[in-house]
Structure formats: structure tokens, C-alpha cells
Amino acid sequence: NSKKVVIAAVNGFALGGCELAMACDIRIASAKAKFGQPEVTLGITPGYGGTQRLTRLVGMAKAKELIFTGQVIKADEAEKIGLVNRVVEPDILIEEVEKLAKIIAKNAQLAVRYSKEAIQLGAQTDINTGIDIESNLFGLCFSTKDQKEGIVSFR
């Protein structure tokens, strides 16, 4: 629920920590990272949003397979199914995450915040309501200094 963009850098096992990574807006993994929801092998269900976030990120069929089997997957598979945004070599993971954070930080922060809000709220409703949310937030941007500067610099 943070208003700021949160980026996860995963460099190793994300099993119990998979829920934490899934709660982030963007997930960058090193090639040695592994992901899973192994709770069923321990006789419990995934907690802390694991069943809900995984389903939203990878789809119901893949989430069921991963949760019901307790399977651990490698970073490249996690990228393929949409669990992580990208995979990089372990020695440049932090550098790549910092680069991405700097790119995001250079943008108008209110617009980034409103974009995140539109995505989050829109995902919880039908498309028409989502478009209404987006439209309202879009309109709020027009009264900002950032928007006026952005339009001038775009020319």
C-alpha cells in the first residue's frame, strides 16, 4: 500500500520471502535466485498474501500448480511466467536495481504515484471503473508544476 514505488532485488532463495517480493511493484532477480511457495510441503497454506498475489501475477492455473506442488522455480522460469520483471547476473543486480530506481525517480513523482494508484485500484474493479479512476487521476496531474514543466520540455 506504499505510495512510493517499491523494487525488490532477489539474489538467492525467495521461499518464505516470495510473499515479500510479490508485494513489491517491480521484482528484479539475479540468475541464481529461486522462487517458490513450499508451504503445502510443511502442512500449511501460503500466508501473507501468497495465494492472492501469486494468482494476480502469474494467473490462476500457474499459481495453482506452484502452490499445490510446492515447486521451487529458477529465476528464468519466474521471468517467463511473469513473477519477476527481469533477470540479471548476480554481480550487477544491485547496480541494475539502482539504475531502474534512478530512472523512476527522475520522473514526476506525483504522476508516478497516481499511475501506481490507477494500476492498483483498477486491478480490483471492472475496466470501466478503472478507466474512470485513471481519468480522475490524469485530471489531477494538470494542476501540477511537474506537468507544466513536462509539457514545455517535451516540445
Curated annotation (Swiss-Prot):
Keywords: Fatty acid metabolism, Lipid metabolism, Lyase. SUPFAM superfamilies: ClpP/crotonase. InterPro entries: ClpP/crotonase-like_dom_sf, Enoyl-CoA_hydra/iso, Enoyl-CoA_hydra_C. One of its GO terms (molecular function) is lyase activity. Coiled coil: none annotated. It catalyses: a short-chain (3S)-3-hydroxyacyl-CoA = a short-chain (2E)-enoyl-CoA + H2O. It comes from the Bacteria. Belongs to the enoyl-CoA hydratase/isomerase family. This is Short-chain-enoyl-CoA hydratase. It comes from Clostridioides difficile. The lineage of its organism: Bacteria, Bacillati, Bacillota, Clostridia, Peptostreptococcales.
